[in-house]
Regions:
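Append "and occasionally in soluble cytosolic enzymes with long acidic Gly/Pro-rich linkers
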Residues: 12-13, 32-132, 196
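Sec/Tat-exported extracytoplasmic proteins
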Residues: 4, 27-29, 44-49, 54-58, ...
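Ligand/substrate-recognition segments at binding pockets and active sites
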Residues: 1, 97-170, 213
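Extracytoplasmic/peripheral linker and loop segments enriched in polar/acidic and small residues
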Residues: 36, 51-52, 72, 89, ...
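Extracellular/periplasmic solute-recognition and catalytic clefts
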Residues: 1-29, 52
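Extracytoplasmic
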Residues: 7, 17-20, 61, 110, ...
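Small-molecule pocket liners
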Residues: 19-23, 64, 191
């Protein structure tokens, strides 16, 4: 029980943490090298459902790898809404059609992939919710949960994966060169999803030289 002297002098505050959970595509593999497929999957995931079911409501969707409300984040960017209609339209544009057994197919091949994650209950639950939502629009998803050392050495380092559910913690330093620069894709480096964008490379390099915080 609270001490009488403190009972009326305390207040509880909620503050968003510096970590986030993400779905990471292997951009060097089909069909994840197709932007429309990635966008469709984003639309098909009910992020509010994940936040309520996994985080007990203590979280919010984000639209970039920067914490909302910080000087590094862009308030004009909005998270993808949950819309199966938009997801299916994008997949249709990408060449997929619904088969008789209600799965998406392109050139005779079903749209299916494996999500891998480490032994973390929140990430396992997140993967299951994603799997259910993607099944609703005709995407086959399997889940594999792997011990961390095997996860890194057998799958991440050699790039032998389709999709991962992982988490990342942000530091006070906004520099994310090691995560997103195209030069950081080697074994043991952090850009293991294979993100490669020349404009982003230039901005990351410029950011490392910039001393003006407002820029």
């Amino acid at each position: 029980p609270a001490k009488p002297k403190l009972k009326n002098r305390t207040a509880l505050y909620k503050e968003m943490g510096n970590g986030y959970t993400y779905l990471g595509f292997n951009l060097k593999r089909e069909p994840f090298n197709d932007k429309k497929v990635r966008q469709a999957i984003n639309y098909a995931i009910n992020k509010d459902e994940v936040i309520k079911g996994v985080l007990l409501g203590l979280g919010e969707p984000i639209s970039s790898p920067y914490k909302p409300g910080t000087r590094w984040s862009d308030p004009s960017l909005k998270p993808y809404e949950y819309s199966t209609k938009k997801a299916l339209n994008l997949l249709k544009e990408a060449g997929y059609k619904m088969s008789d057994d209600n799965f998406l197919v392109k050139d005779g091949k079903a749209l299916e992939f494996e999500i891998i994650t480490n032994q973390n209950k929140q990430r396992e639950m997140t993967a299951v919710l994603i799997q259910r939502r993607l099944k609703e629009i005709g995407i086959k998803v399997s889940i594999r949960v792997i011990e961390w050392a095997s996860f890194v050495n057998r799958f991440i380092k050699p790039g032998d994966f389709d999709v991962v559910v992982l988490g990342w913690s942000l530091s006070l330093d906004p520099d994310q060169f090691n995560i997103w620069h195209s030069s950081q894709q080697g074994p043991g480096q952090f850009n293991f999803v294979g993100y490669d964008n020349k404009k982003v490379d230039q901005l990351l390099e410029k950011g490392r030289r910039e001393l003006d915080l407002d820029k």
